[in-house]
């Protein structure tokens, strides 16, 4: 925010509250409307939001490429096992394609995008999670029934989205969601585990 001359401060507690809104640009708008109501929006507010989000993505990518954001326990192992078993993989997310690309490249492997048959990201559908649209789009593109799939989510909005699409869902919590309840999830785990690491 400092790069844009803004005195906004998203501390850990506030960011946890902002995560109730999916989508980075939507989250910025929500912050202004709900937590910074004295802020006078400039005429180019939509452009400002897009620029803020693009800058955030640049910083995020720099952190990933520098190894400062590790992949969560068990993710790499599970993906490797799924690929060896010939399972079809997809990503259905509200984040931008650039964020997904950076996360896969720097956290998993240079060619990790190719592991997934479909990567549905960002504004590919008009309604973001908790709406099920991103899952419906992915199911249609893969010609799959929800009953043939399992979703992995880490938020209440993600769970609502996948369940509304009819997909059984496993939750892995994070620092922001560890104390949340996830009604309807088939399992709630702190992580996906690494055999041999207790």
Predicted stretch roles:
Residues 21-24, 74, 86, 122, ...:
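Glycine-centered flexibility sites
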């Amino acid at each position: 925010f400092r790069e844009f001359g803004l005195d906004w401060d998203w501390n850990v507690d506030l960011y946890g509250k902002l995560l109730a809104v999916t989508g980075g640009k939507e989250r910025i708008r929500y912050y202004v409307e709900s937590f910074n109501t004295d802020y006078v929006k400039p005429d180019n507010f939509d452009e400002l939001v897009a620029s803020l989000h693009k800058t955030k993505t640049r910083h995020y990518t720099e952190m990933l490429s520098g190894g400062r954001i590790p992949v969560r326990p068990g993710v790499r192992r599970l993906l490797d096992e799924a690929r060896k078993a010939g399972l079809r993989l997809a990503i259905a997310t509200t984040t931008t394609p650039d964020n997904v690309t950076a996360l896969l490249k720097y956290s998993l492997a240079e060619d990790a995008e190719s592991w997934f048959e479909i990567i549905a990201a960002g504004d590919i559908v008009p309604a973001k999670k908790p709406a099920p649209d991103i899952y419906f789009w992915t199911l249609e593109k893969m010609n799959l029934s929800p009953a043939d799939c399992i979703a992995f989510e880490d938020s209440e909005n993600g769970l609502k989205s996948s369940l509304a699409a009819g997909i059984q869902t496993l939750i892995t919590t994070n620092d922001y969601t560890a104390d949340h309840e996830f009604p309807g999830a088939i399992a709630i785990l702190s992580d996906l585990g690494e055999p041999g690491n207790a």
